[in-house]
Amino acid sequence: QQEAQHLLAHRAHVDALIKRYPSLQKTLDNTIQHYENLYEKECLDYHLAYVAGEAAFAPFFGMCIDNREAFFRKGDANVSSLFLWHFCEEIEHRSSGLKIYNHVVGGWWWKIRKLPSMIRHIEECFAAISRDFQKHVPASDWGNDINVFSNPLKDVSIKSRLRCVVGVLAAQMPWHNPAHTSVPGWVGKWSDSYEENQDMARFFGSDEP
């Protein structure tokens, strides 16, 4: 139920963006096609390794949660809450992808060899989306966030960045167990609030228009 609600929230966010900036429909279509092309090009083992590789970035999601004040406090509560919801779910499911890969494929070295191409695919996708947003969203609508793509970590401490990098690198090791990854305490607060039926759609962020 939680994932279904989360999916609908993502879809509503995308629809709202496209309604305001119709040119972003092409961005969505291109992004979907970007993954369709990869799906047709690569084998099942690769796709399972891709999912397992993404799970290794739990330390990055943790960094985003730990620095939620810098990243999300001033943002629209609907959007800030959606992203934090997403990061909490990624951490919650951090073991799933690797477990499936190890059961179906196995082979740590094969997964590591494919990691650069997976990172390149994600970077290409993000770069294309970034270009389109800067092209189709007027500068007047960005406010103080106009440079978000050029320096997204400007308000994150060096210590927090280093902890993230070390965590991501450690997650590539063959003995890594995602279940042992350090989890931000705020994830527990989020889960407890969800169980208490609080409004998670506006759980964090600014109420200012």
Predicted features along the sequence, with ranges:
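Non-heme di-metal
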Residues: 1-209
